[in-house]
């Protein structure tokens, strides 16, 4: 149990730091669509697609690695709450087009990149 807690704790901290760095570096570029949050969710979608397939095909890996990567790192990196606030901020300001655009970018982009990540992992991990 101790190693599981440490794995989640460290992974979440690293994921949150990456999300913060992405926000610092990207959000000011296009304030209407905070690119740091979008990048966090799209990168996280891609990486979790890879991780899910990798862990499913590598049953011998210690469970702490899955907790570190999926529960911790991806949980710290991706952010539904920030995404929700950014969409609703546009909506309450009457900017419904921007609200819809931000929502669509996150949802379509994340689903697409999660699928691409799964495809990538299957291609990498396929028996030769």
Curated annotation (Swiss-Prot):
Family named by the database record: Belongs to the fluoride channel Fluc/FEX (TC 1.A.43) family.
Membrane topology per the entry is: Multi-pass membrane protein
Q: Which UniProt keywords apply?
A: Cell inner membrane, Cell membrane, Ion channel, Ion transport, Membrane, Metal-binding, Sodium, Transmembrane, Transmembrane helix, Transport
Its recorded reaction(s) are:
fluoride(in) = fluoride(out)
What's the stated role of this polypeptide? Fluoride-specific ion channel. Important for reducing fluoride concentration in the cell, thus reducing its toxicity.
| Transmembrane segments annotated in the record for this chain | 5-25, 35-55, 67-87, 96-116
- Which HAMAP family does the annotation name? FluC
> How is this protein's activity controlled?
Na(+) is not transported, but it plays an essential structural role and its presence is essential for fluoride channel function.
Instruction: Give the binding site residues for Na(+).
Output: 75, 78
Listed under GO cellular component are:
plasma membrane
Example of a GO biological process term: cellular detoxification of fluoride
Protein's UniProt name: Fluoride-specific ion channel FluC
Against InterPro entries, the record matches this protein to:
FluC
Where is this protein primarily located?
membrane
UniProt-listed NCBIfam families: crcB (TIGR00494), PRK14196.1 (NF010792)
Molecular function GO labels: fluoride channel activity; metal ion binding
Q: Where in the cell is it found?
A: Cell inner membrane
**Superkingdom of the source?**
Bacteria
